[in-house]
């Protein structure tokens, strides 16, 4: 297999600035520095994490400072965000737009805190609440005046406390009936700004800090000290200094027995409440002397972030609920089990709270809240905010494949020139890098001698070097307004039509070659012509061109799908997708996040954020089939197989593969036989599946499934074997196991008369062969039956674009 690589993408993910867990604990909202918000589905294992929705940033000065979830009609609740421009916004998770905007009239908002739920308040008991004085200093402040207790009892709506820049704490009420945010009251202003705010568990008081379940107040300061206070008396109980920089975030476990702190030194520290009656167990904790009273002790810390950790939140793994399954379950054979190490799968089970951290390195990590030091954290998002890439393999214009890369506010259209002048014994891999920084790359993707054989690999660590290719030639750059970010984009198979949508409406451009320049190389030789789409089209969540490039299909934020003729620029038809739950309860339609069309132009598949699939017939312009979410999970990738326009291949967040017979409205024969018994190594596939790639051949029976960390070759023409029985106890499928370290030219490989190298076969009879990838992958596609293109970026290069973290001395330097 000939591998071509592109590493010249401008990838700079935004820092994580805020985290918030939904009311039911199954979703986590992530706010980033560029103003975007991601909704992640919480999973009970390393498999199942999925970014369901992404709300793109609005403008450069829109900086989110805090996120909260409030009770609402849905189980997850209502999502609110606070901004440094002094506004509070509620977000519509169906249209992905701002639903309500409220001005604080107090300057920048530094933090929000939501009132605890009624159930929590009923289980909380305090002493001498009636005798407590109102405190208005930096430690605590009463959340109500003496005559407001009766108002609290009669108040049904949930309240939020807002810490404002003018030194005032304001209370707002999230109204259930009017679906609005109403101002409630303000507390007396103090000197300086209010930077943090938190409710007591009984909602009787408001604190400037974090509060855990037993009423203890926890705060952090710029000296790296975590302080524990008596919330009733306002006195400091203990202070622990284990951070080498500012304490930026605090979180507590649901039972109030554990506290986590994060700081600018990249550490996440764990403190545990130990009763004075504790005997032998107290010896392992630091800071607890013999015979001591109740105390907060330092348990330990972990440093997996390279930069400041700015946000912490607690979540509960989702209890997996099986959806409607179309296939018949099959029993798996007994065999040897590989012992799992100290990884995420050992502790991430339903009912166990997990800690999630995010910071300036744009990464998200999950830790076990109850056994913080026992297991390694799990990298939730190996490639945060990856760029969207699309390739036209055989365009009508240019000399090679045309590649479109979507960034936050512009599109780059480039021509990739593929040459095949490779020498025998050299690596069949090309690295396209415009900055000439191919410096002794020691290992990349293992090579194979042919896509059809697909099982003959060589250890790439002994390869000499990469064969450097020609960098992509920039043809055009399409920019949108600075205040409007690009939501989605699409390029036709012919490569001459490009469409994108911002937060206002979709746009269409035509790429033309200017013959007057006398050259077809360079940006000056190409021209862009804007075409006017029909009026009335709103912002789009997803779009795609038909296979013959004659129609543009747009999924708008109203839940409808519009079909536009690109020649006449007329609206041909509007599909109204059928969704069972929506039709029964008259709910808004969830956003459609994926669209794909068949090669023969007959079928259109539209997939929403929850995993529901709608199939439309583009010939008669009618809905053909509705498929409820497969195995109860979201769809991560989908595509029609080129060998048959009636075959739709779908992957879900649980790492299941479904082959659907669209014409017959049923599961394909392969899925009926194998989907319920896929190999264990694929069910534990590293990273979330982000794409499918089919060989462009009508006789092909395979597909490459890839994530940001690995790729897997699946051949639907071969049986599926449970490889766990063939592995020795303790053996794992690693990078070394996928190749032979003793078979290359340096170690005396035989060179046959035909000039080709002889490789040792590995897994020659196996299906579902998994290859790990060294660098985060954004896109992978076939250019031909034996050539693939990989768009990737070394994470070390990305880290250099971030601001430098707090200096940490390395031993021995």
Where in this protein do the model-derived segments appear?
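Canonical WD40 repeat/beta-propeller blade segments in eukaryotic WD-repeat proteins
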Residues: 11-20, 59-71, 107-152, 191-199, ...
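Surface-exposed loop and turn segments in beta-propeller and other repeat-based domains
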Residues: 54-57, 285-305, 318, 426-448, ...
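Per-blade loop-tip surfaces of WD-repeat and WD-like beta-propellers in eukaryotic adaptors/scaffolds
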Residues: 1-4, 39-53, 90-108, 117-140, ...
């Amino acid at each position: 297999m000939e591998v071509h690589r592109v590493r010249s993408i401008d990838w700079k993910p935004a820092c994580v600035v805020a985290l918030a867990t939904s009311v039911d604990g199954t979703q986590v909202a992530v706010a980033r520095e560029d103003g975007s918000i991601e909704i992640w589905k919480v999973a009970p294992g390393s498999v199942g994490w999925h970014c369901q929705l992404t709300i793109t940033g609005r403008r450069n000065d829109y900086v989110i400072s805090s996120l909260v979830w409030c009770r609402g009609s849905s189980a997850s609740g209502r999502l609110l965000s606070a901004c440094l421009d002094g506004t509070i916004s509620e977000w519509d998770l169906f249209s992905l737009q701002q639903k309500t905007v409220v001005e604080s009239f107090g300057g920048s908002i530094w933090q929000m805190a939501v009132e605890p739920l009624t159930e929590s308040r009923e289980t909380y008991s305090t002493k001498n609440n009636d005798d407590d004085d109102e405190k208005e200093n930096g430690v605590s402040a009463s959340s109500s005046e003496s005559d407001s207790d009766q108002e609290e009892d009669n108040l049904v709506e949930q309240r939020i406390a807002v810490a404002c820049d003018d030194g005032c704490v304001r209370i707002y009420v999230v109204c259930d009936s009017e679906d609005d945010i109403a101002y409630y009251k303000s507390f007396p202003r103090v000197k300086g700004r209010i930077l943090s705010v938190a409710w007591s568990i009984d909602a009787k008081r408001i604190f400037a800090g974090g509060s855990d379940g037993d009423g203890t107040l926890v705060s952090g300061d710029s000296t790296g000290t975590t302080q524990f206070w008596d919330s009733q008396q306002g006195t400091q109980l203990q202070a622990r200094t284990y951070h080498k920089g500012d304490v930026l975030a605090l979180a507590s476990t649901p039972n109030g027995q554990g506290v986590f702190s994060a700081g600018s030194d990249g550490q996440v520290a764990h403190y545990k409440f130990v009763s004075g009656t504790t005997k032998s167990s107290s010896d392992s904790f630091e800071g607890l002397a013999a015979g001591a009273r109740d105390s907060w002790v330092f348990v330990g810390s972990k440093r997996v972030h390279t930069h400041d950790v700015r946000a912490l939140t607690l979540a509960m793994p989702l209890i997996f609920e099986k959806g409607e399954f179309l296939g018949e379950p099959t029993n798996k054979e007994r065999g040897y089990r590989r012992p799992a190490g100290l990884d995420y799968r050992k502790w991430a089970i339903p009912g166990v709270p997990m800690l999630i951290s995010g910071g300036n390195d744009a990464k998200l990590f999950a830790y076990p809240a109850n056994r913080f030091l026992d297991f390694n954290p799990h990298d939730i998002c190996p490639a945060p905010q990856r760029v969207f890439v699309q390739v036209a393999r055989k365009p009508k214009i240019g000399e090679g494949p045309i590649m479109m890369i979507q960034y936050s506010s512009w599109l780059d259209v480039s021509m990739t020139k593929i040459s095949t002048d490779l020498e025998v014994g050299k690596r069949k891999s090309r690295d396209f890098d415009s900055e000439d920084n191919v410096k002794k790359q020691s290992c990349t993707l293992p090579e194979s001698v042919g896509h059809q054989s697909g099982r003959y690999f060589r250890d790439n660590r002994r390869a000499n070097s990469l064969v450097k290719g020609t960098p992509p030639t920039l043809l055009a750059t399409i920019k949108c307004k600075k205040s409007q970010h690009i939501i989605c984009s699409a390029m036709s198979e012919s490569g001459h039509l490009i469409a994108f949508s911002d937060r206002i409406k979709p746009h269409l451009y035509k790429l033309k070659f200017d013959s007057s320049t006398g050259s077809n190389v360079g940006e000056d030789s190409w021209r862009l012509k804007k075409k006017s789409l029909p009026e009335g089209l709103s912002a789009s969540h997803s779009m795609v061109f038909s296979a013959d490039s004659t129609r543009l299909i747009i999924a708008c934020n109203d839940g409808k799908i519009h079909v536009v003729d690109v020649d006449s620029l007329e609206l041909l038809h509007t599909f109204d997708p059928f969704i069972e739950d929506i039709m029964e309860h008259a709910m808004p339609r969830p956003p459609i996040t994926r669209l794909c069309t068949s090669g023969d132009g007959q079928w259109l598949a539209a997939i929403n954020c929850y995993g529901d699939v709608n199939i439309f017939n583009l010939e008669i312009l009618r809905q053909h089939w509705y498929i409820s979410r497969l195995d109860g999970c979201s769809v991560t990738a989908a595509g029609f197989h080129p060998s048959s326009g009636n075959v739709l291949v779908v992957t879900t967040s649980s790492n299941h593969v479904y082959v659907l017979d669209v014409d017959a409205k049923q599961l394909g024969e392969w899925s009926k036989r194998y989907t319920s018994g896929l190999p264990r190594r694929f069910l534990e596939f590293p990273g979330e599946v982000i794409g499918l790639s089919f060989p462009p051949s009508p006789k092909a029976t395979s597909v490459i499934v890839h994530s940001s960390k690995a790729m897997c070759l699946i051949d639907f023409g071969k049986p599926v074997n449970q490889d766990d029985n063939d592995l020795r106890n303790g053996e794992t499928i690693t990078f070394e196991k996928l190749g032979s370290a003793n078979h290359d030219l340096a170690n005396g490989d035989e060179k046959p008369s035909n000039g080709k190298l002889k490789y040792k076969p590995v897994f020659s009879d196996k299906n579902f062969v998994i290859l790990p990838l060294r660098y985060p992958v954004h896109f992978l596609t076939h250019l031909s039956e034996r050539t693939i293109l990989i768009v990737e970026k070394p994470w070390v290069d990305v880290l250099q674009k971030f601001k430098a973290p707090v200096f940490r001395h390395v031993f021995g330097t």
